[in-house]
Amino acid sequence: MKKIIKNILPPFMLFLLNKIYFVYLLNKNKLSIKKDSQDIEIYNDPITAQKLEEWGKGSVWNEIVLLLNGKKGKILDVACGTGKNILDLKVTNPEAILYGCDISQFLIDIAKNKGIDNDKLKCIDATKLDYEENFFDYSYSIGSLEHFTDEGVDQVIDKLYYVTSVASFHMMPVSKKNKNEGWTKTYQTFHNNNIDWWVSKFKKKFKTVYVVDSSWNDFISNGKWFLCYKK
């Protein structure tokens, strides 16, 4: 049905309808947001799996391929979902050893069914990563860290610093108003904060942090890559 509507309506009308629905979700969810609680159950929904197959096309999925172009060694996809990016990187980085982890066994099973090696996938909360120190050369996440609680973000960064030897790359939405708008919710809860908020988080552990524009955006956020190096 959605595809039919997209084919029938002109782009301006689609944009307007999407914006109306987006604002509706923001207002509807304001009273029900729990500050210290993540929306985890959403990851076991087939609709979520379908969205994860599509949302980064033409933007962030191209960007992670470019960022990791030519990189070798072990690379971890944090919150890998259905494994879409791992499969893309297998083509462009044939000499790399690609791993993925996700909190949802449902999504991990989909990744396994796509042919990703079982021993390279793990169902685990990213705040509890149990890989050895410097096990990976690189790690990355796309649209993931913003969904952790404030404390959870710090815990994930601590773990990624421990298990990554060279650099960790992360794409998140940041507030278009350049404000710390805090814990909010559209389809699921997330932090919609400014660039400095994220940089301060990463610099608690990583020595060097670069911020690069992403081509992704929505009605309240712009996408940014945070390139975090240990040296």
Q: Model regions: which residues?
A:
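Conserved helix-to-beta-strand junction in the class I
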Residues: 159-163
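Short catalytic micro-motifs in class I SAM-dependent methyltransferases
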Residues: 143-147
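A conserved beta-strand element that flanks and buttresses the S-adenosyl-L-methionine
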Residues: 140
